[in-house]
Amino acid sequence: MDIIIRPTRKSDYNQLLEVEIAATPGLSYLPNVFDKFLHDITGHFLTAEVGGKVVGCGKFSMMIDGSAWLETLRVLPEFQGIGVGKAFYDEFLRL
């Protein structure tokens, strides 16, 4: 199963809301930060796909002191445990 990590697009919004609802029930964070994350030049807002299906998102930012901050990481429950989170981390480290 190939995991594709790519930049998030505005058109991913509805699918990523579904990811957030499934992955973190009762937490509504993404609607408040989606546009900010898309335009944040200090970080990377990425989306994971498996078989053409959006299965997760992650936001990684570099801090002034050189440290990094993983602001959010969401993966659909049925895709947890197959390496999606690791794929995000690997891509963040590459960036």
Per-range role (PLM):
Residues 1-32:
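Short amphipathic alpha-helix that is part of the acyltransferase structural core
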Residues 2, 45-47:
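N-terminal "mature head" segments of proteins
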Residues 36-41:
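Short loop/turn motifs at secondary-structure junctions and domain boundaries
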Residues 47, 53-61, 69-74:
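Conserved beta-strand in the GNAT
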Residues 75-77, 81-95:
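Conserved acetyl-CoA-binding loop-helix of GNAT-fold acetyltransferases
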